[in-house]
Swiss-Prot record:
Keywords: Cytoplasm, Glycosyltransferase, Purine salvage, Transferase. Its EC number is 2.4.2.7. Homodimer. GO terms for molecular function: adenine phosphoribosyltransferase activity. It catalyses: AMP + diphosphate = 5-phospho-alpha-D-ribose 1-diphosphate + adenine. This is Adenine phosphoribosyltransferase. Coiled coil: none annotated. SUPFAM superfamilies: PRTase-like (SSF53271). Catalyzes a salvage reaction resulting in the formation of AMP, that is energically less costly than de novo synthesis. Pathway: Purine metabolism; AMP biosynthesis via salvage pathway; AMP from adenine: step 1/1. GO terms for biological process: adenine salvage; AMP salvage; purine ribonucleoside salvage. One of its GO terms (cellular component) is cytosol. Signal peptide: none annotated.
Length: 181
């Protein structure tokens, strides 16, 4: 990946201190997607990186995974599959629950969206603890798909998501790695 493009993408992401609570450095991707040149560079970089790797579907998790996953799928001429919270998908679904800091959450996938033999790229905006993507990967595998990689715009390695996904056999690709929470 082009180092100059990666620096441009990183410079387009604003950091908001003490949001949503004191001590947190919030990584704001809206500043990136508001900038047409930076947004296009991000999509083009991911699409080009994965173009010749046999990917058959792009999966994005609710909600910001849609922002990046759908245009990457379009740029690659592939279908986009949304993974959503309960009650948002109209057809038959499979679901996977996962732990949060305080409680659990659940994600759903249409039962016919991924078929055996699909080689899937998971795209999301940010990798923190990895819980959401780990649940997404479990859904894809239960549906018979193979997860090629999980690609993120931002990774926060100190929160353990990179290690968690790698331990689960998932290759992690992040355009920008940032310190902090």
């Amino acid at each position: 990946m082009n180092p100059e493009t990666l620096k441009f993408i990183e410079a387009s992401i604003k950091t908001i201190p003490d949001y949503p609570k004191p001590g947190i450095l919030f990584r704001d991707i809206t500043s990136l997607i508001e900038n047409a040149e930076a947004f296009k560079a991000t999509i083009d970089l991911l699409a080009e990186h994965y173009r010749d790797q046999g990917i058959t579907k792009i999966v994005g998790t609710e909600a910001r995974g849609f922002i990046f996953g759908a245009p990457v799928a379009f740029a690659m001429g592939l279908g986009f599959v949304p993974v959503r919270k309960p009650g948002k998908l109209p057809r038959a679904v499979i679901e996977e629950s996962y732990a949060l800091e305080y409680g659990t959450d659940t994600l759903q996938l249409h039962t016919d969206a991924i078929v055996p033999g699909d080689k899937v790229l998971v795209v999301d905006d940010l990798l923190a603890t990895g819980g959401t993507v780990d649940a997404t990967v479990k859904l894809i595998r239960r549906a018979g798909g193979e997860v090629a990689d999980a690609a993120f715009i931002i990774s926060l390695p100190s929160l353990g998501g990179d290690a968690r996904l790698t331990a689960a056999g998932i290759k992690v690709v992040s355009l920008v790695e940032l310190a902090g929470e």
